[in-house]
Design a protein with these regions (language model features):
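Short, contiguous, well-structured surface segments enriched in hydrophobic/aromatic residues
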Residues: 30-69, 110
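Residue-level recognition of alpha-helical structural elements
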Residues: 48, 71-78, 131, 178
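Short runs of predominantly hydrophobic/aromatic residues within well-ordered alpha helices
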Residues: 52, 78, 82, 135-138
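Short, hydrophobic, well-ordered secondary-structure elements
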Residues: 56-97
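"Short basic amphipathic alpha-helical interaction patches in structured regions
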Residues: 81-83, 99-108
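Short amphipathic alpha-helical interaction/hinge segments
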Residues: 93, 97-100, 150-153
Length: 212
């Protein structure tokens, strides 16, 4: 019988290479956060550090939520969480590289004034990559999964005896989708680590590294 609740020893996608990489990055991220968090206590913080104190924990929490949903086989739910997860990581990068964006964040990040996820991605592409990486349609898939348009069906369909069906519970037979979610999550969690490290002047912690 399929377990009602999976544990790390019997989860359905255990052993997937990208899932293992995601796990290792999460451990490194939590280790770095344990170093940076105390630095935010007591001292006067910069505007960037105040933004990081909000955005970094939210990004990590969403990463852990995505990981747990994968463990329990709720892949569509994990996919839907990708947009708020990515948006926080992108916002953190955006306010780090854009002083006007940081000021707008400190003023409350008014939805009528703040840039969209797509516009932030376009700005970062120009700023960091000199426009070399096409970003057109960057937010399209994230929006599709979030808002439930017909295109979103691709992440919630499996084949049963050759017939496409839309599961309402655990999806235990889509390793490709599990890989896709991990592949999307890894670079953005890594970027959040980089921004956290930069905001608090810490070296990033990687697998096998030593901390003080």
């Amino acid at each position: 019988m399929t377990p009602v609740v999976f544990t790390p020893s019997d989860e359905p996608y255990l052993g997937r290479e990208l899932l293992c990489a995601f796990d290792n990055l999460i451990c490194s991220c939590l280790e770095l956060n344990a170093k940076c968090a105390p630095l935010s206590h007591g001292d006067e913080l910069t505007d960037l550090q105040r933004a990081a104190c909000i955005l970094v924990p939210q990004t990590i929490t969403l990463a852990l939520s995505i990981r747990e949903l994968i463990r329990q086989g709720y892949l569509f739910g994990a996919k839907v969480l990708m947009r708020p997860f990515v948006e926080r990581a992108v916002t953190l990068m955006y306010v780090f590289h854009n002083s006007e964006g940081l000021e707008l964040w400190n003023q409350g990040w008014d939805y009528r004034k703040r840039p969209t996820l797509q516009k932030m991605a376009d700005y970062l592409n120009e700023k960091l990559l000199h426009g070399q990486s096409p970003m057109k349609g960057f937010s399209q898939a994230f929006n599709s999964a979030t808002h439930g348009d017909p295109f979103s069906a691709q992440w919630n369909v499996v084949f049963h005896e050759g017939v496409p069906v839309f599961p309402v519970s655990k999806n235990l037979c889509s390793p490709g989708l599990a890989d896709e979610i991990c592949a999307e999550a890894i670079p953005w969690l890594a970027s959040a680590m980089g921004m956290m490290s930069a905001a608090f002047n810490q070296r990033e912690v990687g697998p096998g590294s030593k901390t003080n």
